[in-house]
């Protein structure tokens, strides 16, 4: 007899990566719940997202991180809690942790991670402080004895591949004439399509192999340097791009001189594409790799992703 699939609550489900996780959960056959603030329903864009959730059979629960009672009530209905709250709310996840402790029924908590392994990064400010909040949440989860999985996903394909990592507002497709490469362009980065990140993450929620572990989503075809990504694109369009290298010293200077949120983005880009912070070895005592655990998931390679734009 097949094991019954867990009931999943997504907090922050109308956000960027949250939408993909809600959809993946519902499509994988989990009873899926999304905690939504009343104010979200009046937002025309997010209101449409909520309706799309309902069309998938998702149960919409009304609540708020600042309403402890609503959190506990929502959490008591599920087995797994996935948080996808944004960067400004990372530390507010202590409220989710408190509600999980009071509810007493949660088998797994996945806090808002979905990026680098924050315990193993050499990021400069302001990314360093942003990651520090996630580290604090990890330590709180562990201290409270809450069962967890940390989803370390590398970069979102939708953030980086349509622009070839170019920081140009308004750019919606890869450049066909010139490109700026960060540093020497040789540091390898992990980049995954959002739907694949969600599929792997949902697979992990009921898997004992991922309990109290870090789930690294690092399929072999999706770990490439910026130089390699540019070369793939050049082959697809049949021409060479004019390349300009931005030295690390200049990037660090730009980070210091840029306003929020540009400095945050640039410091993350420095961590990923100059330091190579997403391309780390996996320590088996606390980490597992998603594509090895779930070879049945047909992921989109970076090469295939770029073909959408060629």
UniProtKB/Swiss-Prot annotation:
Binding of NADP(+), residues: 12-18, 37, 46, 138
Gene Ontology CC terms, in alphabetical order: cytosol; mitochondrion; plasma membrane
Pfam families in the record: NmrA
Entry keyword Oxidoreductase: yes
Primary localization: cytoplasm
Biological processes per GO annotation: response to oxidative stress
Induction statement: Induced by cadmium.
Protein's UniProt keywords contain Glycosyltransferase: no
Signal peptide (residue range): none
Keywords attached to this entry: Cytoplasm, NADP, Oxidoreductase
GO molecular function: oxidoreductase activity
Residues forming the catalytic site: 134 (proton acceptor)
Superkingdom per UniProt: Eukaryota
Enzyme class: oxidoreductase
Compartments reported by the entry: Cytoplasm
The EC number(s) this enzyme carries: 1.3.1.-
Homology family: Belongs to the NmrA-type oxidoreductase family. Isoflavone reductase subfamily.
PANTHER family noted in UniProt: ISOFLAVONE REDUCTASE HOMOLOG P3-RELATED, PINORESINOL REDUCTASE-RELATED
Protein name as annotated: Isoflavone reductase homolog P3
